[in-house]
Amino acid sequence: IDRRFYEKQYTMIDPKHFEPIVEGMWRGVNVGGTSTVARLDGWDVCGKTGTAQNPQGRDHSTFLSFAPKDNPRIAISVYVENGGFGASAALPIASLLEEYYLTDTVTRPWLVEMVKQKTIYYPAYGK
C-alpha cells in the first residue's frame, strides 16, 4: 500500500467545522437514525447513510463510516449500484468489513446472512 495512505492528510478547512459533522455521524449510529445497525460493542463508530437517485433504475446505496470516533483506525465507503436505500445494502456490507478489520471476527451471523440473501437489481445493459 502506498505510504501516502498511512499519513494524515490536511485540508484548508478550519477543523472547527468537522466537530459537528463527526458528532452527527456518531449520533446517527449510536443514538438513533438510519445507521444504528453499524453499532459495534466497544467501538465508537461514526457513519452516514446515503441514497443516490438513479433516473435509469433503482437508487444507489451508500454508506460512509470510520471508527473509532477519536483517532480512527479505519475509514470505509461502500457504494452499491442499484442497491436501494443506504441502510439496506451499503451499510451492512461496510459494517461487517469494519467489524472484521477492528476485531478480527464477525459477531453478527444474521447480518452476514442478510447480505448474502440480498438481491441487487442489475438493469439489462446493451439492449
Locate each region found by the language model.
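Active-site beta-strand/loop architecture of penicillin-binding DD-peptidases
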Residues: 1-10, 16-108
